[in-house]
Design a protein with these regions (language model features):
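Active-site- and interface-proximal helix/loop "cap" or "latch" segments in soluble metabolic
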Residues: 1-88
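Helix-rich C-terminal "cap"/substrate-channel and partner-interaction subdomain
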Residues: 44-47, 52, 394-482, 550, ...
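N-terminal Rossmann-like FAD-binding beta1-loop-alpha1 element of flavoenzymes
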Residues: 99-129, 552
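Conserved N-terminal/central alpha/beta ligand/cofactor-binding core
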Residues: 126, 135-247, 251-254, 365-374, ...
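Helical element adjacent to the flavin cofactor pocket in flavoenzyme catalytic cores
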Residues: 224-284, 324, 328-330
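A glycine-rich dinucleotide-binding beta-alpha-beta segment and adjacent secondary-structure elements
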Residues: 256, 447-530
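Glycine-rich loop(s) and the adjacent beta-strand/alpha-helix scaffold that form part
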Residues: 274-277, 281-347, 546
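An anion/pyrophosphate-binding glycine-rich loop and adjacent beta-alpha core
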Residues: 324-326, 332-443
Length: 556
């Protein structure tokens, strides 16, 4: 089959015309997402002996590809696949014992939701976490998971001087000083503790390296093992499963916040995405951690007309702004909604964030245009890069690096699945010469050679006089060469619910709504006009933990 990240192989054991078991031999799907979908679908197929089964919401591509792969295996076994696909339908069903009362209900099963739920549960409260998709993780799983952490252990080992104050300055400057300095201070001062919480409470493992994200003044971003946020979600899911007073309910979309007679939030109305049944979850406090609205084109256009359907998105299909809709319906204030970020280097066909282009963040690649020229400083802010790319021929940019960079960083081996997929689709090319690489994308080869020669001279001189490259300069002086195309896609919505430093949601008069808290991308006014890379992880785990703690305190 062909899933989101390339091909995978399955083994189907058939006896007397029935499937006995399904084994996934080789899969490159996102850990905690595609693999979970395949496991659940396997059970449906084997238990019901049919290929007429539902996919898993949030992993639609992986689901369809897996079902097709099982069908291919059945064909090889001599079965009539068309007959298997017309057998009685088998769908997933709700759990039989869904708890409808809790001390704290958390809406959203991404990083912020897990941080809030685990924190509140560890405080002794009964917690129910609702996730509308059939898989957990949201945008956290789809991200690289890198986390801005001043004073981290790698900085200390490498002698990098940094501080929470410096991170706060970078974040405020990176968002044109629109973000709330007090909220930014909370993130900057809390992210080191949050990274340690992930390590010791969550069991998250880290690479022994840092990335230099655009807009930061120093290299400070730690990297989860595997260079993916799914490392965090898989480990947090495991930890949550060990806590007796924490229940996770998937395929349950929260639709409405419930208030009691005093005006305090006292629960959530929800709808099963499987059965359509209505549920009400009574609670003494609610934490909204259900992400932004990057996948909701109508909401994007409502607040920023430029962000229409011509622009693809890196976000989870679940990023629909549900929390904003529910909270604003009871008077919560929305703030900074017009500020929508695009990530500069995304798959031009699907909008997916390109992990191989982290070569730029490893300070080993340059960005060029159709004319073969550099057009921006590669480590500038995301909005600066995106706007620069949009103004190039075809609204497209191209990333260039060489084999030495690939070998030294190990990035292509780390993301071999993505690389293979991109190569098959012609989005990336490996060539022995610059001329050959340029020809693949019809880039001006002579100008590209001049650009590389000029860049190599900058590296020797120690100064980029064109765009003032901020990291250590490097040469691209020998092949093979790699070149890939990319364009910006919607990645993050800076606007959201107005919150206090205690994660309390404010109403339009500026008063806190009793019993309602928010954390992560659903909460706004932290990033200003633009978010610096790796600050989202710092935010979601810091404010997620605060929201869980404050909700537990409110319950008493």
């Amino acid at each position: 089959g062909v899933g989101k990240h390339g091909t995978f192989n399955v083994e189907v054991a058939v006896k007397d015309g029935a499937i006995e078991r399904i084994n996934v031999l080789d899969a490159r799907e996102t850990q905690g997402m595609g693999d979970v979908a395949m496991e659940e679908i396997s059970k449906l197929i084997v238990d019901n002996q049919t290929l007429n089964v539902d996919g898993v919401s949030g992993a639609t591509l992986s689901s369809g590809a897996f079902i097709n792969a099982v069908g291919d295996a059945l064909t090889q076994a001599g079965a009539d696949v068309s007959e298997w696909k017309t057998r009685a339908h088998a769908g997933m069903s709700d759990a039989e014992d869904i708890p409808t009362e809790a001390d704290v209900v958390v809406v959203g099963g991404g990083g912020a939701g897990f941080a809030a739920a685990i924190t509140a549960a560890n405080a002794g409260k009964k917690v129910v976490l609702l996730e509308k998709l059939g898989i957990l993780g949201g945008d956290t799983s789809l991200s690289g998971g890198e986390m801005a952490v001043p004073g981290n252990w790698i900085q200390l080992k490498q002698g990098v001087k940094d501080s929470p104050e410096t991170l706060a300055e970078d974040m405020l400057k990176g968002g044109d000083n629109v973000g709330d300095p007090e909220l930014v201070k909370v993130i900057a001062e809390g992210t080191l503790d949050s990274s340690q919480w992930l390590t010791f409470e969550g069991g998250v493992s880290w690479e022994h390296d840092l990335l230099f994200f655009g807009g930061h003044s120093v290299m400070r971003s730690i990297i989860p093992q595997g260079h993916t946020g799914s490392e965090m979600i898989v480990k947090l899911t495991k930890r949550a499963g060990e806590i007796e007073n924490l229940t996770i309910v998937k395929n349950m979309r929260a639709t409405e916040l419930v208030k009691d007679a005093s005006g305090a939030v006292a629960g959530v109305k929800a709808e099963s995405q499987l059965s359509g049944d209505a549920h009400e979850f009574k609670a003494k406090a609610v934490v909204l951690a259900c992400g932004g609205f990057g996948s909701n084109v109508d909401m994007r256009v409502k607040y920023n007309a430029d962000m229409d359907d011509k622009i693809l998105s890196t976000d989870s299909v679940g990023a629909q702004g549900d929390g904003l809709t529910m909270a604003s319906a009871i008077g919560a204030e929305l703030i900074d909604m017009q500020y929508i970020q695009t990530y500069p280097t995304c798959d031009p066909e699907t909008g997916a964030l390109l992990y191989v282009d982290d070569m730029r963040l490893e300070s080993r690649a340059i960005m060029v245009n159709k004319e073969g020229d550099r057009f921006v400083e590669e480590l500038d802010r995301r909005d600066v890069l995106s706007n620069a790319i949009k103004s190039q021929t075809g609204g497209m940019g191209y990333m260039l690096w060489n084999q030495a960079a690939a070998d030294e960083t190990g990035l292509l081996k780390q993301h071999a699945d993505e690389y293979d997929n991109l190569e098959k689709r012609g989005i990336i090319v490996k060539a022995d010469t610059l001329e050959e690489a340029a020809a693949h994308f019809e880039i001006d080869a002579d100008e590209l050679k001049k650009t590389v020669e000029r860049w190599n001279q900058f590296a020797k001189d120690g100064k980029d006089t064109d765009f003032n490259y901020r990291a250590d300069l490097f040469t691209i002086d020998a092949g093979p060469y790699y070149l890939n195309s990319y364009k910006p896609a919607v990645h993050y919505t800076m606007g959201g619910l107005h919150i206090t430093t205690n994660a309390e949601v404010l109403d339009e008069s500026g008063a806190a709504i009793p019993g309602l808290y928010a954390a992560g991308e659903v909460a706004g006014h932290k990033m200003g006009t633009n978010r610096l890379g790796s600050c989202s992880m710092a935010d979601i785990y810091t404010f997620g933990r605060i929201a869980g703690d404050q909700a537990a305190n409110f319950v008493g």
